[in-house]
From Swiss-Prot:
Any one cellular-component term (Gene Ontology): plasma membrane
Record-annotated disulphide pairs: none
Bilayer topology annotation: Multi-pass membrane protein
UniProt-listed Gene3D superfamilies: bacterial mercury transporter, merf
Keywords, sorted A to Z: Cell membrane, Membrane, Transmembrane, Transmembrane helix
Spans through the membrane: 7-27, 34-54, 69-89
Subcellular location(s) per record: Cell membrane
Organism: Haemophilus influenzae (strain ATCC 51907 / DSM 11121 / KW20 / Rd)
Signal peptide residues on this chain, from the entry's feature table: none
Taxonomic classification: Bacteria, Pseudomonadati, Pseudomonadota, Gammaproteobacteria, Pasteurellales
Full protein name: Uncharacterized protein HI_1049
Length: 97
């Protein structure tokens, strides 16, 4: 199962009709990984503060606060997966062998 993770991104690009040859150059931007990780976690923490502690309820005109909290935690799990998979994926692949 872990070996199929390498094929997900090309399959998604194929479905949307986008070439993935530009992904070869992304290794040059590895130095930006940690700062962008910090920025995304700070933005998510700010969203948590707005959702849980803010007096003014934001984005609640069409959806209840309870649904927003459930959606927040679902997105949090997905975000943590995408932020950590470059670190965890080699470990998972090593366990599979």
């Amino acid at each position: 199962m872990a070996s199929t993770l390498c094929c997900i991104a090309p399959l998604i690009y194929l479905v949307f009709g986008v070439s993935s040859t530009w992904l070869i150059g992304l290794g040059e931007y590895d130095y930006l990984r940690i700062p962008m990780l910090i920025i995304s976690l700070c933005a998510f923490a700010y969203g948590f503060w707005l959702l849980m502690f803010s007096k003014k309820i934001i984005c609640s005109k069409y959806i209840s606060r309870k649904k927003l909290i459930v959606l927040y935690w679902i997105v949090f799990i997905v975000m943590i997966f995408f932020l950590t998979y470059p670190t965890i994926l080699p470990w998972i692949l090593e366990l599979a062998n």
